[in-house]
Amino acid sequence: MGRFLKTAVDALKVFILFTGFTALFYYAMIWVNQEYENYHRYDKPEGSAVKVVEMDQDEKGGWFDRLIFFYQNGE
């Protein structure tokens, strides 16, 4: 009976540690999410920024050609 009790106590310790670290990880993820929630990554550039891509209006081809171009070049 003593061996069973020791095993049960050890299992309880592991369960408590697992639960504690899971809760710690969960609240850390919530903290990181709140920290970066209002971070605007896509603000309009300031200064002498240059537009990188300009669509050509004379280009013949529709959405399918652009999709194929995207699959081939990854852009």
Curated annotation (Swiss-Prot):
Q: Where in the cell is it found?
A: Cell membrane
What UniProt keywords are attached to this protein's entry? Cell membrane, Membrane, Transmembrane, Transmembrane helix
Q: Where are the transmembrane segments?
A: 12-32
Keyword Cell membrane listed? The answer is yes
This entry carries the following GO cellular component terms, namely: plasma membrane
Membrane topology is: Single-pass membrane protein
Output the InterPro entries linked to this UniProt entry: DUF4227 (IPR025321)
Q: What is this protein called?
A: Uncharacterized membrane protein YqzK
Please name the source species: Bacillus subtilis (strain 168)
Tell me what gene encodes this: yqzK
